[in-house]
Amino acid sequence: MKKLTAVTTVGITAVALSLALVGCGSNTKTETNASTSITTTASKAAPTTSAEAAGPNKTIQDYIRENQIVETPIHRGDPGSPTIDLQVPPGWSDAGPSTPDWAYDAMVYDQPKVPDDPPRITAIVFKLTGNVDPAKILEYAPGELKNLPGFEPLTNGNRSTLSGFDAFSLSGNYMKDGKKRVIGRKTVVIPGQDGLYVLQMTADALADELGTLMEATTKVIDVQTTITP
């Protein structure tokens, strides 16, 4: 089984993952913020907060702004903080050069039903410093997905753990470019000596690829990902 290894830390200035974590559609993954964003344009450059999806549900970004918390995006290979090992499920591949600059890792399904719109799983990591309450991060984790156009939850969302660290997961359907899509995001809080690290993994695909995403996330990523602080 293939494995993606990320050694995460600080040192990169704050820039605009949740999915999300994910790109929606053919190599077009765009997040408005390192901490929570979903999708709209095909760009590998760091996006800005102005593109963040607005809505009635409070988000992690709202919490960060209201409490003047400093957010630092983390990239794979940065020395000095948690080591995160993501297993690449069978039938999936590392996204390679199509991985956005703001993501720490991404993977894509090899045999999609629609070749130019394959299922994707994208991970982002960021560090928060200041008056940060991990419980609040998990409380507001579902906000951005709930603000997506036409979002209909497949579950009520649930608290869980990933590699022993507290997490929150939510999945549902939403509309983009007139097409029904499925999206799921797991947000994980990882306490560190110099701040709170947050991992967000977002899976996104056309709605009829739900089974593909479920197979990858529940049978491989959720059970085989390891985090070493």
Regions found by a protein language model. Give the residues of each.
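Bacterial N-terminal signal peptides that target proteins for export
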Residues: 1-11
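Bacterial lipoprotein signal-peptidase II cleavage site
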Residues: 6-7, 20-34, 38-47
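Bacterial N-terminal signal peptides
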Residues: 11-20
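N-terminal low-complexity, Pro/Thr/Ser-rich intrinsically disordered segments
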Residues: 41-77
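Secretory pathway targeting signatures of secreted, lumenal, and periplasmic proteins
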Residues: 75-132
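Surface-exposed amphipathic alpha-helical segments
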Residues: 92, 197-229
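Short, surface-exposed beta-strand/loop micro-motifs that present aromatic residues
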Residues: 105-111, 182-192
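Signature of long, low-cysteine stretches enriched in small and polar/charged residues
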Residues: 138-189
